[in-house]
């Protein structure tokens, strides 16, 4: 339960800071200028559906539910730079582990699943995009997976799965690599 709550809070904070402010519908509309679109990913072992969208008011701290999408364990997600797509992991410790692509309507807060691709590495716990590719860090798989993005925003099959090797001093916890994050540099 604590893990689910922490995931909701962390993803909500990151995605609300990564999405653009809703454009004012009328000049001088202060309330519309204070609203952000917030996307929340959850673990789905309980009653959760997976992905949720909210309209978040920065001024008074309220969130209004907009929509939901059923997807399993989207514990980490990232919006595309233009906000038209959401990419989310499905965190599993088996062959079900996947990256999902959704079309996203910011005005309505609605999701439409485009497709899902297997990561080839267990427990994807981080996802990032540079606009051309989506990359996952696969914690238990000790790997990263690279997915080219198709013209419609969907994900093509992994073009590469890079598996790391090695162990640490604590043989019980560090028997193999456990990736937490992958970042793309501008160079």
Language-model segments: what does each one mean?
Residues 57-59, 104-108, 150-152:
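Short loop/turn segments that connect beta-strands within beta-propeller blades
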Residues 33-34, 79-83, 129-132, 184-187:
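Residue-level detector of Asp-centered blade-edge/turn motifs that repeat once per structural unit
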Residues 44-47, 91-96, 140-143:
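Short glycine/acidic-enriched loop and turn motifs that connect beta-strands
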Residues 109-181:
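Asp-box/WD-like beta-propeller blade repeats and closely related beta-sheet repeat scaffolds
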Residues 25-56:
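An edge-strand/N-cap motif at the start of beta-rich repeat modules
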Residues 34, 47, 73-75, 123, ...:
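Beta-rich catalytic cores
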Residues 1-33:
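Bacterial Sec-dependent N-terminal signal peptides
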């Amino acid at each position: 339960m604590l893990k689910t709550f922490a995931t909701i809070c962390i993803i909500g904070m990151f995605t609300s800071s990564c999405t653009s402010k809703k454009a004012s519908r009328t000049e001088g509309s202060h309330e519309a200028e204070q609203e952000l679109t917030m996307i929340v990913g959850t673990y789905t072992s309980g009653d959760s559906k997976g992905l949720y969208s909210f309209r978040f008011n920065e001024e008074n701290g309220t969130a209004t539910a907009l929509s939901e999408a059923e997807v399993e364990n989207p514990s980490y997600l990232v919006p595309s730079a233009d906000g038209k797509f959401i990419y989310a992991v499905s965190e599993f410790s088996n062959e079900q582990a996947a990256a999902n692509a959704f079309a996203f309507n910011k005005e309505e807060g609605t999701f439409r699943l485009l497709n899902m691709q297997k990561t080839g590495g267990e427990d994807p716990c981080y996802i990032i995009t540079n606009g051309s590719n989506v990359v996952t860090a696969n914690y238990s798989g000790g790997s990263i997976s690279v997915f080219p993005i198709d013209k419609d925003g969907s994900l093509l099959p992994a073009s590469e799965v890079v598996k790391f090797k090695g162990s640490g001093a604590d043989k019980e916890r560090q028997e193999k690599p456990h990736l937490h994050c992958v970042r793309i540099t501008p160079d």
